[in-house]
């Protein structure tokens, strides 16, 4: 009968193992039966082991690649915040040709010289709009309530970590979207973490009627102290 063939004659090596207690025909039979009952599990196990041991070394990301991936992920998560600053994007990278010693003609967002009379026709009382100022820094031109141009410009670079601070007309404040710093309508800090008020520059009008920014080196009229930026 077929069942009588299950008891196979042990090999010499198996007989030797049996003397040491490491082999018995019943154990061999059970091992063969188990492998016969679960062939699929054995194949899956072999397949997984094969995949795990066959990954080329150049496909395993090193630390540099992982750091790059983390930075890309951080950038993707930062996109909603960056969207809040799109109207101010033209002022994030100052032009390299900006001078710092003397006065400089103010320029609008597309790089055109700002003419005071034309500016005041399109910007009403209380307006605060960005222009390119000293060293190319984004600087607010301030329109007074009598529709004249204020004699000072307000540097828009936050004194905390350098974000461009938007003007919030409804709040009558400059509100930094990065970390919550606040400045009053003249740029004086009223809430941290920013440690200092926004820098000032003189805002003059040239003989040609153009707006000119000049470094402010006198006492800060908002604090009564020497200007920290000079």
Swiss-Prot record:
It catalyses: 2 oxidized [plastocyanin] + a plastoquinol + 2 H(+)(in) = 2 reduced [plastocyanin] + a plastoquinone + 4 H(+)(out). The keyword Amino-acid biosynthesis does not apply. Binds 1 [2Fe-2S] cluster per subunit. It comes from the Eukaryota. Disulfide bonds join 163-178. It is an enzyme of class 7 (translocase). It holds the Pfam family Rieske. Its EC number is 7.1.1.6. Signal peptide: none annotated. Residues 1-20 are annotated as: Disordered. Residues 1-16 have a biased composition (Low complexity). Belongs to the Rieske iron-sulfur protein family. Component of the cytochrome b6-f complex, which mediates electron transfer between photosystem II (PSII) and photosystem I (PSI), cyclic electron flow around PSI, and state transitions. NCBIfam families: Cytb6fFeSPetC, PRK13474.1. This protein is 1 of 2 subunits of the cytochrome b6-f complex that are encoded in the nucleus. The 4 large subunits of the cytochrome b6-f complex are cytochrome b6, subunit IV (17 kDa polypeptide, petD), cytochrome f and the Rieske protein, while the 4 small subunits are petG, petL, petM and petN. The complex functions as a dimer. This is Cytochrome b6-f complex iron-sulfur subunit, chloroplastic. It comes from Fritillaria agrestis.
